[in-house]
Amino acid sequence: MKKVITYGTYDLFHQGHYNLLKRAKELGDYLIVGVTSDYFDKSRGKFNVRDSLMTRIENVKATGFADEIVVEEYFGQKIDDIKKYGVDIFTVGSDWKGYFDYLNEYCHVVYLERTKGISSTQIRNINNLRLGIVGNESVLDRFLDELKFVS
């Protein structure tokens, strides 16, 4: 049996998360998904996570792709989990390309292409804009459409 493991925060769960988990599952027979704890996120400087740990776990569970879900709580846990669960493949999104190459010592590392045009950061930014703009809804919609073309 080929075991695959992936990790993420999975905040504001969206199609990109779903696609990544689906492709991770297709890499093997058994998928373990690590969801970062609130404490671990904060220790890495991620202070803008909106969803609770339980909500994020439930969202991952609802996809039906995860055979097992673990909570990532500390630096170095990836190596410990790979050894503990006898993992064959570690996978994450291509935005991390090269960052986890050191794990090739323990298993095969695969970087999956991200879903273009969506991220939790983009969703947060759009929600912040919506909260910060008062006025006609059609003006807001046009403004948000125009943002797609401005970098």
Predicted feature descriptions by range:
Residues M1-S151:
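Nucleotidyltransferase catalytic core that binds NTPs
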